[in-house]
Structure formats: C-alpha cells, structure tokens
C-alpha cells in the first residue's frame, strides 16, 4: 500500500462563492443533445494557508468512470474502511460492455450472519469466478486497441487470489490510478465519522448501482470509442475506457467531471 502522507498544517476558511454553468453533450437515443449541467460552486477564497481537499469514498471493485470523476481534483482519496459491507453494491461488482450489452461482473464473497466490516469480507474461491471473469473480459475486450497493453496488470492482480475483498479492491484501485497517471495518495479511515471534517468531500453512497441518476451530480458522460455497436454505453467500469482509449482515458475522465473540487 502507498506510504502515508502528512497533510500540510492549515486552517480551512469559508469564503464567498460564485457559480458557473457548463454545457455538455449527451448521446440520447443515438442523437447528441446539449444539456446544462447543474451550477457548480467555485470557492473564491481569501489568501491563506493551503488546505488539503480529501475525497472520502467507499472502495469498489473495478470502479466505474463516475467514481474517478467524483474524486478528480482532490488532493487525496480517503477510503472508508470502517463501514459495514453492503450487499448488491459496487463493492463486489462492476459493469462492462459486451456483444449483448452491459453485463455485470460479480465477485462472490463468503457470507456471514449479521454485520461484517468491509475489511473482514473474504473472497469465495469455491466458485471459479476469476477464470469466468477473465474469459468474459477476453471475449469482450480482446479486440480492443489497448487490451494487450493493460490487461497483464489486471491479470496479475486477479490471479494472486488474495484473501479479502478489501485487499483486492485496494490493489485494483491503485492499478486504475496508475493507468490514469494520477499521483493521488490513498489514505484510509480509522473511525467511521457521520460528519467528516469541513475539508472532506463525503462521497460515501454517492455512487449507487440502483440509483444511477445520483452520479449526475458530479459526472456527465463524455463519449469515446467503444468496442460494441453504435450506441454509447455510459459509466461502465474504468477498464472499458482504458482498454478502448488507452492514454486518452485520463483526459476523458477529467472532461466528465462536473463538480470541480477547488483547493
């Protein structure tokens, strides 16, 4: 895991704000339509000490593009490691593209009765999910322009067969940040805070597989070349973008980030 970084000593000050409006292009029913994104608050601060902006978020399996749009602009990511595991969420699944449209990749875990800390959730290797995931990825992205370049990194992590879901997701998140060439340090919580500090952007539960519209608070889809069909599928796992666009992935994620976080 990355080394811990010490934040610079500073005081956070509330300051006047102003609004800007962004116009974005969306593909709807095969047509490009222009929509106005929500107003974005820009912090117009008085000169003073620098305050690190922290993006607090839960850990996901091969996170979607909106995940990275949400944390883009922060100085650091803080992973919520003190939460309880929530079933049927992105914590153990992702969405990819295929010849049959969007499909999920679900990581089976060993279930326990009652509440289980996310760090204590074990992976279930009685099911051959790694081989199944890998075959599905090869079938879906084998012809993608950058699959052969990036796939070995993913293969190496999956086939390590680590014990815990959190550990797997941590390594995959680090891999994705490396692909984007983002030098954003990853930290972790040591207590669950209902009300985080004022310099913390609380993104916990902001990205919900069952409430996709929530993502549009900070994410608007930017179209890119995809492997299948003429209809663009938005907000898939970052691996879809990376396998299809390679080094351009970072600029596409940045362009999709609506809620610019100001230091």
Where are the regions a protein language model picked out?
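Short terminal hydrophobic/aromatic SLiMs and anchors at protein ends
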Residues: 5, 19-20, 35, 50
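Short, composition-biased linear "edge" segments at structural boundaries
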Residues: 18-28
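Residues lining hydrophobic/aromatic ligand-binding pockets adjacent to catalytic sites
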Residues: 30, 40-44, 48-263
């Amino acid at each position: 895991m990355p080394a811990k970084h010490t934040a610079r000593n500073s005081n956070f000050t509330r300051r006047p704000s102003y609004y800007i409006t962004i116009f974005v292009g969306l593909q709807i029913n095969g047509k490009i339509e222009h929509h106005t994104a929500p107003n974005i608050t820009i912090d117009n601060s008085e000169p003073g000490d620098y305050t690190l902006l922290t993006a607090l978020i839960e850990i996901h399996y091969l996170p979607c593009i909106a995940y990275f749009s949400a944390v883009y602009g922060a100085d650091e990511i803080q992973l919520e490691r003190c939460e309880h595991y929530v079933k049927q969420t992105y914590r153990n699944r992702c969405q990819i593209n295929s010849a049959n449209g969007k499909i999920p990749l679900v990581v089976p875990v060993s279930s326990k009765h009652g509440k289980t800390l996310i760090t204590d959730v074990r992976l279930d290797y009685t099911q051959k999910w790694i081989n199944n995931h890998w075959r599905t990825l090869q079938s879906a992205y084998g012809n993608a322009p950058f699959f052969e370049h990036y796939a070995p990194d993913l293969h190496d992590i999956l086939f390590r067969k680590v014990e815990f879901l959190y550990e797997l997701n941590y390594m995959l998140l680090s891999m994705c940040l490396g692909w984007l060439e983002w030098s954003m340090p990853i930290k972790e919580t040591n207590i669950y805070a209902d009300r985080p500090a004022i310099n913390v952007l609380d993104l916990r539960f902001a990205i919900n597989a069952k409430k996709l519209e929530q993502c549009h608070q900070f994410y608007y889809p930017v179209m890119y070349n995809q492997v299948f069909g003429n209809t663009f599928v938005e907000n898939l796992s970052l691996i879809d973008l990376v396998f299809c666009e390679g080094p351009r992935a970072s600029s596409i994620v940045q362009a999709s980030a609506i809620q610019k976080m100001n230091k």
